[in-house]
Amino acid sequence: HHLLDIGTGSGCIAISLDKRLPDADVEAWDISEEALAIARTNNEELESRVLFRQRDVLSDDWEKSPSFDVIVSNPPYVTEAEKDEMEANVLDWEPALALFVPDDDPLRFYRRIVTLGRELLLPEGKLYFEINRAFGREIAYMLEMNQYRDIRVIKDIFGKDRIVTANR
């Protein structure tokens, strides 16, 4: 299996997948070279085999071909309006680039990844998102409008929408 983590940050999801699924090939993308340097250090220290690449998923300046069985993403999804509700420890340790989206376009990364999934996922490929609890219905609808199947919105331990899954 070939898995892709979009917006990998420190690489924790990609490295966890690699450790849990030793027969899988895991690739991870991020726009931030600084984040990728941390991810590569984590990869080395944890003796993982993830391939990290610097990619801006919002641009079209790279070749796309269907090759992934699974795409996972925990993209930026906190609106600027929600910033005041954030815990100080999150704001102190997470770069703003990894957290925030404009109030006028909070679904920009989801919209782009849904489109990319149509290009990058193999038939029957699976898409997994962590989401802002306020947008579960909108993201599920977006997936439906893009001909994804078996769409599920999964709640976290507090009963809030947190994960969306879908099949190509």
What are these language model-derived features?
Residues L17, V90, I113, G117:
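Class I S-adenosylmethionine-dependent transferase superfamily signal
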Residues Y77, N167-R168:
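C-terminal beta-strand of the catalytic ATP-binding
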Residues H1-E85:
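Conserved SAM/SAH cofactor-binding pocket of Class I
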Residues Y77-R108:
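Mobile active-site "lid"/loop adjacent to the S-adenosyl-L-methionine
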